[in-house]
């Protein structure tokens, strides 16, 4: 679960 959240956060930051 935490890993998925971190992955999503990283994806959003990369999108910026």
UniProtKB/Swiss-Prot annotation:
Compartments in which it is found: Secreted; Target cell membrane
Protein's GO biological process: defense response to bacterium; innate immune response
UniProt keyword annotations, A-Z: Amidation, Amphibian defense peptide, Antibiotic, Antimicrobial, Immunity, Innate immunity, Membrane, Secreted, Target cell membrane, Target membrane
Top-level lineage group: Eukaryota
A GO cellular component annotation in the UniProt record: membrane
Modified residues (Leucine amide): 16
Chief localisation class: secreted
Regions that span the bilayer: none
Tissue expression notes: Expressed by the skin glands.
Family the entry assigns: Belongs to the frog skin active peptide (FSAP) family. Alyteserin-2 subfamily.
Described function: Shows more potent growth inhibitory activity against the Gram-positive bacteria S.aureus (MIC=50 uM) than against the Gram-negative bacteria E.coli (MIC=150 uM). Has a weak hemolytic activity against human erythrocytes (LC(50)=135 uM).
Listed name of the protein: Alyteserin-2a
Organism field: Alytes obstetricans (Common midwife toad)
Lineage: Eukaryota, Metazoa, Chordata, Craniata, Vertebrata
């Amino acid at each position: 679960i935490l890993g998925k959240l971190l992955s999503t956060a990283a994806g959003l930051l990369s999108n910026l």
